[in-house]
Amino acid sequence: MASEELFEAEFSEEQDLEHQQAMETEEAELAETEEPLEITEESPDNPEAESTTEQLTEKPVTNGNKAPADNEAKMTQLPLARIRNIMKLDPDLHMANNEAVFIVAKAVELFIASLSRESYTYTAQSKKKTIQKRDVDMAISAVDSLLFLDGAMNF
Protein backbone atom coordinates (compact mmCIF):
# COMPACT_ATOMS: atom_id res chain seq x y z
CA MET A 1 0.00 0.00 0.00
CA ALA A 2 1.70 3.16 -1.19
CA SER A 3 0.94 6.55 0.26
CA GLU A 4 0.11 7.88 -3.22
CA GLU A 5 -2.92 5.59 -3.28
CA LEU A 6 -4.06 6.96 0.08
CA PHE A 7 -3.85 10.55 -1.06
CA GLU A 8 -5.68 9.92 -4.33
CA ALA A 9 -8.50 8.07 -2.61
CA GLU A 10 -9.06 10.19 0.47
CA PHE A 11 -7.61 13.65 0.05
CA SER A 12 -8.77 15.30 -3.13
CA GLU A 13 -8.79 19.06 -3.62
CA GLU A 14 -11.99 18.75 -5.64
CA GLN A 15 -13.81 17.29 -2.64
CA ASP A 16 -12.57 20.15 -0.47
CA LEU A 17 -13.71 22.75 -3.01
CA GLU A 18 -17.12 21.11 -3.35
CA HIS A 19 -17.49 20.97 0.44
CA GLN A 20 -16.46 24.62 0.81
CA GLN A 21 -18.90 25.72 -1.91
CA ALA A 22 -21.71 23.73 -0.29
CA MET A 23 -20.98 25.35 3.09
CA GLU A 24 -20.99 28.83 1.55
CA THR A 25 -24.33 28.25 -0.19
CA GLU A 26 -25.87 26.87 3.00
CA GLU A 27 -24.70 29.92 4.96
CA ALA A 28 -26.12 32.24 2.30
CA GLU A 29 -29.46 30.42 2.29
CA LEU A 30 -29.68 30.54 6.08
CA ALA A 31 -28.93 34.25 6.14
CA GLU A 32 -31.57 35.00 3.50
CA THR A 33 -34.43 32.93 4.89
CA GLU A 34 -35.46 33.60 8.44
CA GLU A 35 -38.90 32.12 8.92
CA PRO A 36 -41.04 32.30 12.04
CA LEU A 37 -41.32 29.07 13.97
CA GLU A 38 -44.68 27.69 15.09
CA ILE A 39 -44.76 26.43 18.63
CA THR A 40 -47.78 24.43 19.71
CA GLU A 41 -48.58 24.11 23.37
CA GLU A 42 -51.31 22.17 25.09
CA SER A 43 -53.04 23.90 27.96
CA PRO A 44 -54.98 22.08 30.69
CA ASP A 45 -58.09 24.16 29.86
CA ASN A 46 -58.08 23.30 26.19
CA PRO A 47 -57.22 19.70 25.30
CA GLU A 48 -56.64 20.69 21.70
CA ALA A 49 -53.30 22.21 20.85
CA GLU A 50 -53.23 25.96 20.54
CA SER A 51 -51.05 27.26 17.77
CA THR A 52 -48.95 30.31 18.52
CA THR A 53 -46.45 31.88 16.21
CA GLU A 54 -43.37 33.37 17.73
CA GLN A 55 -40.59 35.20 16.03
CA LEU A 56 -37.29 33.64 16.99
CA THR A 57 -34.23 35.34 15.66
CA GLU A 58 -31.05 33.37 15.31
CA LYS A 59 -27.67 34.96 14.93
CA PRO A 60 -26.48 34.26 11.40
CA VAL A 61 -23.04 32.84 10.89
CA THR A 62 -20.74 35.68 9.97
CA ASN A 63 -17.38 35.64 8.35
CA GLY A 64 -15.79 37.96 10.90
CA ASN A 65 -12.11 38.11 11.68
CA LYS A 66 -12.29 36.22 14.96
CA ALA A 67 -14.46 33.30 13.81
CA PRO A 68 -12.07 31.79 11.23
CA ALA A 69 -9.07 32.03 13.55
CA ASP A 70 -10.99 30.28 16.32
CA ASN A 71 -12.24 27.62 13.92
CA GLU A 72 -8.76 27.07 12.48
CA ALA A 73 -7.32 26.56 15.95
CA LYS A 74 -10.01 24.01 16.73
CA MET A 75 -9.57 22.21 13.40
CA THR A 76 -5.92 21.39 14.00
CA GLN A 77 -4.45 19.07 16.57
CA LEU A 78 -1.04 20.68 16.52
CA PRO A 79 -0.37 24.00 18.31
CA LEU A 80 -0.32 26.80 15.75
CA ALA A 81 1.95 29.01 17.88
CA ARG A 82 4.64 26.35 18.01
CA ILE A 83 4.39 25.75 14.26
CA ARG A 84 4.74 29.49 13.70
CA ASN A 85 7.87 29.53 15.89
CA ILE A 86 9.36 26.61 13.95
CA MET A 87 8.59 28.37 10.67
CA LYS A 88 10.32 31.53 11.93
CA LEU A 89 13.54 29.56 12.48
CA ASP A 90 14.02 29.72 8.70
CA PRO A 91 16.14 32.82 7.98
CA ASP A 92 14.39 33.36 4.62
CA LEU A 93 10.99 33.70 6.29
CA HIS A 94 10.27 37.14 7.70
CA MET A 95 6.57 36.89 8.46
CA ALA A 96 3.99 34.10 8.35
CA ASN A 97 0.29 34.93 8.26
CA ASN A 98 -2.34 32.81 9.99
CA GLU A 99 -3.46 31.09 6.79
CA ALA A 100 0.06 29.92 5.98
CA VAL A 101 0.56 28.57 9.49
CA PHE A 102 -2.79 26.78 9.30
CA ILE A 103 -1.96 25.19 5.92
CA VAL A 104 1.42 24.00 7.19
CA ALA A 105 -0.24 22.54 10.30
CA LYS A 106 -2.80 20.64 8.21
CA ALA A 107 -0.07 19.38 5.86
CA VAL A 108 1.96 18.12 8.81
CA GLU A 109 -1.10 16.38 10.26
CA LEU A 110 -1.80 14.66 6.93
CA PHE A 111 1.86 13.63 6.65
CA ILE A 112 1.87 12.19 10.16
CA ALA A 113 -1.38 10.32 9.44
CA SER A 114 0.06 8.86 6.24
CA LEU A 115 3.31 7.81 7.92
CA SER A 116 1.44 6.24 10.82
CA ARG A 117 -0.87 4.29 8.46
CA GLU A 118 2.11 2.96 6.56
CA SER A 119 3.87 2.08 9.82
CA TYR A 120 0.80 0.37 11.20
CA THR A 121 0.70 -2.07 8.29
CA TYR A 122 4.05 -3.44 9.48
CA THR A 123 2.85 -3.41 13.08
CA ALA A 124 -0.21 -5.46 12.11
CA GLN A 125 1.94 -7.91 10.12
CA SER A 126 3.95 -8.65 13.24
CA LYS A 127 0.66 -9.09 15.17
CA LYS A 128 1.34 -6.20 17.52
CA LYS A 129 -0.81 -3.25 18.53
CA THR A 130 1.86 -0.65 19.26
CA ILE A 131 3.85 1.04 16.52
CA GLN A 132 7.56 0.80 17.25
CA LYS A 133 10.63 2.44 15.75
CA ARG A 134 11.39 -0.58 13.56
CA ASP A 135 7.89 -0.40 12.04
CA VAL A 136 8.45 3.24 11.09
CA ASP A 137 11.88 2.38 9.66
CA MET A 138 10.35 -0.41 7.56
CA ALA A 139 7.63 1.92 6.26
CA ILE A 140 10.23 4.56 5.35
CA SER A 141 12.33 2.05 3.43
CA ALA A 142 9.33 0.48 1.66
CA VAL A 143 7.50 3.61 0.45
CA ASP A 144 9.26 5.65 -2.23
CA SER A 145 7.72 8.95 -1.17
CA LEU A 146 9.11 8.50 2.36
CA LEU A 147 12.70 7.74 1.35
CA PHE A 148 13.77 11.31 2.15
CA LEU A 149 13.37 10.32 5.81
CA ASP A 150 15.95 7.53 5.49
CA GLY A 151 18.41 8.00 8.33
CA ALA A 152 16.22 10.51 10.16
CA MET A 153 15.33 7.95 12.81
CA ASN A 154 18.97 7.48 13.85
CA PHE A 155 19.32 9.42 17.09
From Swiss-Prot:
Top-rank lineage group of the source organism: Eukaryota
Residue stretches of biased makeup (Acidic residues): 1-16, 24-48
Listed Pfam families: CBFD_NFYB_HMF
Gene3D superfamilies referenced in this protein's UniProt entry, alphabetically: Histone, subunit A (1.10.20.10)
GO biological process: DNA-templated DNA replication
Main location: nucleus
Annotated spans, Disordered: 1-76
UniProt keyword Zinc-finger, yes or no: no
Protein name (record): DNA polymerase epsilon subunit 4
Provenance organism: Drosophila melanogaster (Fruit fly)
Gene: PolE4
